[in-house]
């Protein structure tokens, strides 16, 4: 059996340094006035989605999970600082790290993607408990049938989750790949695993991409796409 491996590099690799301009905390903002358009903070998101008064319920039963598929790790000190500045001076938010398939974690080497994901998830869902999965492997590892093979991060992550007695009700990941780059068989297997999570009452959110929905080319070089 021949294994084919593709290494996907996230678009945030060369991201610019965030603006250092101070922003008012969420609790001090006038919710009828839109926040600065050149910054995306928790205030920006709560204004756009009109969720100023939202308070997470049943936080002793619910949980929010975030997947990390590359060595881009969050940092507790950074999270505490972010929450104090942008989430009504809350400073006790934490997250649990779970390693899957040999995934690593180095709190002394935080990266943009890891910090961004855990910080915004925590700010918008606090005090709901947060779990960070660090998944080892590579993106798009498939055999000569086109199906995902051991070592594929999505396959390893799905199989791990489905083997747990309890799974967070909401899961978010900002990693993905273009549909045209996936064999049909690969996509079908992963779709069935998604369905199994859905059958257990789990909602899985995926980012639309750094440039928004429809920014990529859905047609491959060898034929039309995407898969229907």
Positions of the model-derived regions?
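Substrate-binding/charge-relay-adjacent region of secreted/lumenal peptidase catalytic domains
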Residues: 1-228
């Amino acid at each position: 059996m021949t294994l084919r491996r593709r290494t996907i590099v996230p678009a945030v690799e060369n991201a610019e340094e965030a603006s250092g301009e101070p922003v008012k905390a969420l609790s001090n903002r006038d919710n009828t006035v839109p926040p600065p358009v050149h910054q995306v903070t928790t205030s920006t998101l709560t204004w756009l989605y009109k969720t100023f008064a939202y308070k997470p319920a049943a936080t002793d039963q619910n949980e929010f999970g975030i997947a990390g598929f590359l060595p881009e790790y969050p940092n507790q000190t950074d999270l505490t600082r972010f929450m104090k500045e942008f989430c009504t001076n809350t400073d006790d938010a934490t997250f649990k790290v779970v390693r899957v398939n040999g995934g690593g974690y180095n709190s002394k080497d935080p990266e943009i993607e890891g910090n961004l994901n855990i910080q915004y998830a925590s700010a918008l869902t606090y005090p709901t408990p947060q779990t960070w999965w660090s998944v080892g492997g590579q993106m798009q590892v498939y055999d000569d049938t086109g199906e995902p093979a051991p070592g594929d991060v999505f396959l390893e992550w799905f199989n791990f989750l489905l083997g747990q007695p309890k799974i967070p009700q909401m899961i978010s990941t900002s990693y993905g790949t273009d549909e045209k780059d996936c064999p049909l068989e690969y996509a079908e297997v992963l779709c069935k695993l998604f369905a199994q999570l859905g059958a257990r009452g789990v909602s899985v959110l995926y980012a639309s991409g750094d440039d928004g929905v429809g920014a990529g080319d859905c047609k491959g070089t060898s034929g039309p796409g995407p898969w229907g």
